[in-house]
Amino acid sequence: MHKVQLIIKLLLQLGIIIVITYIGTEIQKIFHLPLAGSIVGLFLFYLLLQFKIVPLTWVEDGANFLLKTMVFFFIPSVVGIMDVASEITLNYILFFAVIIIGTCIVALSSGYIAEKMSVKHKQRKGIDAYE
């Protein structure tokens, strides 16, 4: 495929993911659920994939792109906290340790789950999962 076609394919797949997340946000608003809209969207996305309403091939490259660039999504929250550092009256070392540990736990658990799902998917397709 040409680079332009790959970029368009990636953008369309990211668009599907964004639309599903947006629908989850709207569901959360309509039903006043006690969960974040993005979490509702993630659960909706999971159900759509499990019941094969949305085939994995429609979003696989876009999801892999997001997984590869996931670390960049954690940077704004850390920078945002640094902007309000003067308002934080806690012990700074403890506060930043909790932030760093929490970020690492989220990143590691997300990566672990994604890896397990990838291995399971490859095994279903009959591909050597640990190539």
Curated annotation (Swiss-Prot):
InterPro entries: Holin-like_CidA (IPR023760), LrgA/CidA (IPR005538). Pfam families: LrgA. Its main location: membrane. Coiled coil: none annotated. It comes from the Bacteria. PANTHER family: HOLIN-LIKE PROTEIN CIDA, HOLIN-LIKE PROTEIN CIDA-RELATED. HAMAP family: CidA. Increases the activity of extracellular murein hydrolases possibly by mediating their export via hole formation. Inhibited by the antiholin-like proteins LrgAB. In an unstressed cell, the LrgAB products probably inhibit the function of the CidAB proteins. When a cell is stressed by the addition of antibiotics or by other factors in the environment, the CidAB proteins possibly oligomerize within the bacterial cell membrane, creating lesions that disrupt the proton motive force, which in turn results in loss of cell viability. This is Holin-like protein CidA. The gene is cidA.
